[in-house]
UniProtKB/Swiss-Prot annotation:
Species this protein is from: Haemophilus ducreyi (strain 35000HP / ATCC 700724)
Domain of life, per lineage: Bacteria
One biological process term in Gene Ontology: translation
Protein name per its UniProtKB record: Large ribosomal subunit protein bL36B
Keywords recorded for this protein, A-Z: Ribonucleoprotein, Ribosomal protein
High-level lineage: Bacteria, Pseudomonadati, Pseudomonadota, Gammaproteobacteria, Pasteurellales
Recorded family membership: Belongs to the bacterial ribosomal protein bL36 family.
The keyword Ribosomal protein is assigned to this record: yes
NCBIfam families reported for this sequence: PRK00831.1 (NF002021), rpmJ_bact (TIGR01022)
Amino acid sequence: MKILNSLKTAKSRHPDCQIVRRKGKLYVICKTNPRFKARQR
């Protein structure tokens, strides 16, 4: 999982990527290709 300052590029890396908010942090999750997972600082 990458830790990024901005998730704008992370969500457009794959069509299945979606942004989720958990416990006050923003995550990008991708079911089909889990290597695109990311979290915002």
